[in-house]
């Protein structure tokens, strides 16, 4: 799954420039019901600005409340350490950054440094749904020993009993025993028959 196929392209984004006031940033976020927006100008990506960051800054720095939101520019408080990825990177890399960097999006920048778009948490959830084939077919969850041939054995049972595999995911349950959970989405009119054959073959059904 390439990033370019799931990113929100730059021409569909609402952005703000580094020299704009933080009041303008707040107004844009309020108007569009956003929690954060990218900071960019032309093809250059600078970072992100969020409501939380603005409010925290304002209440820490303006205790006398005499200063105004118009007194400060976006570049003075924006987050500049937003991770970037290439359009041809895999979505797994974007998911990793979103998890470990605590950001609302990952910026997509090409090899020339041109800002192309962003990858959001929503995009990751969508790809996760597609990967697992949710809302498609029937779900079969099997506990199998981590030994060679188990996957081949399962798929053979399914195909021999008029089943079509939509998706196949192997999950490590982090247990003390050497087993894996295999989650399969199957398109079939013989689901019960497949269940029985899987059980007869020694697999445990979850």
Which residues are covered by each model-predicted region?
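OB-fold/S1-family RNA-binding modules
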Residues: 29
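Tandem CBS (Bateman) regulatory domains
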Residues: 1-12, 50-86, 90-100, 111, ...
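Cytosolic beta-strand hydrophobic patch enriched in CBS
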Residues: 16-18, 35-49, 85-86, 104-119
